[in-house]
From Swiss-Prot:
InterPro entries for this protein: ERT1_acuK_gluconeogen_tf (IPR050335), PAS (IPR000014), PAS-like_dom_sf (IPR035965), PAS_13 (IPR056751), Zn2-C6_fun-type_DNA-bd_sf (IPR036864), Zn2Cys6_DnaBD (IPR001138)
GO biological process, one term: carbon catabolite repression of transcription
The keyword Nucleotide-binding is assigned to this record: no
Domain of life: Eukaryota
Free-text function comment from the UniProt entry: Transcription factor which regulates nonfermentable carbon utilization. Activator of gluconeogenetic genes.
UniProt region (Disordered), positions on chain: 66-103, 144-166
Name by which UniProt lists this protein: Transcription activator of gluconeogenesis ERT1
GO cellular component, one term: nucleus
One matching Pfam family: PAS_13
PROSITE patterns named in the record: PAS, ZN2_CY6_FUNGAL_1, ZN2_CY6_FUNGAL_2
Organism of origin: Eremothecium gossypii (strain ATCC 10895 / CBS 109.51 / FGSC 9923 / NRRL Y-1056)
Subcellular location(s) per record: Nucleus
NCBIfam families, per the entry: sensory_box
Keyword Transcription among record annotations: yes
């Protein structure tokens, strides 16, 4: 008897991966499929390798990022495996594995805790097993075109659907944030009429507006509105008008009544299918950047900032253009006071930059762009009119609230070299240079508050009185890198009229008669 048991034990070889039935019964299995035990019990169709339990440190790693196993799971299954067994193995897999292989929806973990990721992923698998949502290919959900794939192809496992899902997956692997401002035609188009009487000759020439400064000139408007900005858009609107010559009748058509007011809902209708389970987080906002604007936010990701910026930003030409603009705007007495304030910090800038190499200057520009990208994430959420400019006064960033407050658009201020002093009145410009010379190197508290600051609008004679807070941001070398200005409008309360004063006095008299002392 002992010899017979030893022969059976010698014939039975242990395997690394047991089948589903043997693993459930906790018995020894074989490497061949179907195994001997499943054949005896009539379970050949379900005799497949049991799925491996994922390690805890791999619980939050997506399936496509897992390391490739050195040995496949069914390598021990011998070459004599029939087609029926292969079909049984593919059919016994869970629905989530089939849809994942075909490029269907996969719920990725979005929590910072591994335990929470494991718990919610398990609940998601239980809830979404064998549902219609899991059978919708990724190409249908994230396709930007207006003609999605037909339902017959979407719900089938054909090669075309799999190929479309692979293409959509490659698109999803790319950076999802697109540049909204790059889709506009020419940035010179918005500057018509805002550069003075020589606007047409300036825009028709090939002069670089980022190196040669042309100041903004507010326009005199009779009705006091921003209608002069819409004259250039009249041709585009006229093309959309529908007119019937036979009855001399115009038909209503969609037109933008206030083009200077941004519409937050215009990017929502993108032609894609929306599902609440696949919605993005609300903190993912659209980054507004332009790679052809060297002074503004040029890229939308940190990787692009650190890899694509290969030259420093030149502040010297900006300082020279700023001095020329001050000479053309102010009188001699005011220029002496401003130059005295500039002379207090300008030599320090030059002396601090003497020992810096070109690599240091490139790193300073990368730090500026990275800080500006980080500030964009919360400036768009606070809702306060905000403007950011460099240490030479050149504007590099502004939010929508600042555009609504002043009347200037983002393209008008950022599509050329524009200084913050162009948007301030004379008294505010004088206070600006005094404050800058005081905070730049004398006072390192980093912020300054101005109770009164008057902003200029595109309409001549129209100003906005504000109370502003300026914050200085320094780089790693201690030099002022950027100034962040928050502007809050001062709402003047109307003086009480004579009738209101008489009514208040009558109320006081009647109250005194009714309650004698």
């Amino acid at each position: 008897m002992m010899t017979v048991h030893r022969d059976k034990a010698a014939k039975r070889k242990k395997t690394n991966v047991a089948c589903v039935n043997c693993s459930r019964s906790h018995v020894t299995c074989e490497s061949q499929r179907p195994c001997t035990r499943c054949v005896k019990k009539g379970l050949e169709m379900s005799c497949v390798n049991a799925p491996r339990k994922r390690r805890k440190y791999l619980a939050d790693v997506p399936e496509d990022q897992l390391p490739i196993p050195l040995k496949p799971a069914d390598a021990d299954a011998g070459p004599g495996m029939s087609e029926r067994d292969g079909a049984a193995e593919s059919g016994s897999k869970g629905p989530e594995h089939q849809f994942q292989d075909q490029g269907k929806i996969v719920h990725k973990p979005k929590f910072l805790s591994n335990a929470a990721n494991l718990e919610y992923s398990t609940l998601s698998d239980i809830i979404h097993q064998d549902t219609l949502l899991n059978k919708i290919p990724v190409s249908l959900l994230y396709n930007g075109t207006d003609s999605p794939t037909p339902p017959s192809e979407a719900l089938s496992g054909t090669h075309s659907a799999s190929h479309g899902a692979d293409v959509a997956g490659s698109r999803l692997s790319e950076r999802p944030v697109h540049n909204v401002l790059n889709s506009m035609s020419s940035s010179r188009f918005v500057l018509r009429g805002l550069l003075g009487p020589q606007t047409d000759s300036i825009l028709s020439s090939n002069v670089d507006l980022f190196k040669v400064h042309f100041p903004l000139v507010p326009q005199a408007v009779a009705d006091g509105t921003l209608d002069f900005k819409r004259h250039s858009q009249g041709s585009m609107v006229a093309k959309k008008l529908r007119y019937d010559k036979s009855i001399n009748q115009y038909y209503l058509s969609p037109a933008c009544a206030l083009p200077e007011v941004p519409n937050p809902n215009k990017h929502l209708c993108n032609g894609t299918v929306s599902f609440s389970l696949e919605s993005r987080a609300p903190d993912e906002h659209q980054v507004l950047y332009r790679s052809d604007w060297p002074h503004s936010l040029r890229y939308g990701t940190p990787m692009e900032i650190y890899t694509l910026i290969s030259e420093p930003f030149c502040h010297t030409s900006g300082f020279h253009s700023l001095l020329k603009y001050l000479h053309s705007r102010f009188h001699r007495h005011d220029l002496v006071e401003m130059c005295r304030s500039i002379a207090e910090f300008r030599p320090i800038f030059i002396a601090s930059a003497v020992d810096l190499t070109e690599e240091d200057m490139i790193f300073m520009e990368q730090s500026y762009q990275r800080t500006l990208l980080e500030y964009d994430r919360f400036i768009t959420q606070i809702g306060t009119p905000t403007c950011v400019w460099r240490r030479n006064g050149q504007i590099s960033y502004l939010n929508d609230e600042f555009c609504l407050l002043t009347g200037w658009t983002r393209e008008e201020l950022l599509s050329k070299m524009t200084f913050i002093v162009e948007l301030l009145d004379d008294n505010s410009v004088r206070e600006y240079f005094k404050t800058f010379s005081k905070v730049a190197y004398k006072d390192f508290k980093g912020f300054e508050q101005m109770e009164t600051c008057v902003l200029l609008s595109p309409i001549e004679g129209r100003t906005i009185e504000c109370s502003c807070m300026w914050t200085w941001k320094r780089d790693v070398f201690g030099m002022p890198m950027m100034i962040v200005g928050h502007f809050l409008p001062v709402i003047a309360h109307p003086e009480p009229r004579d009738t209101d004063r008489l009514a208040d006095s009558d109320f006081c008299i009647s109250a005194g008669e009714g309650n004698p002392i």
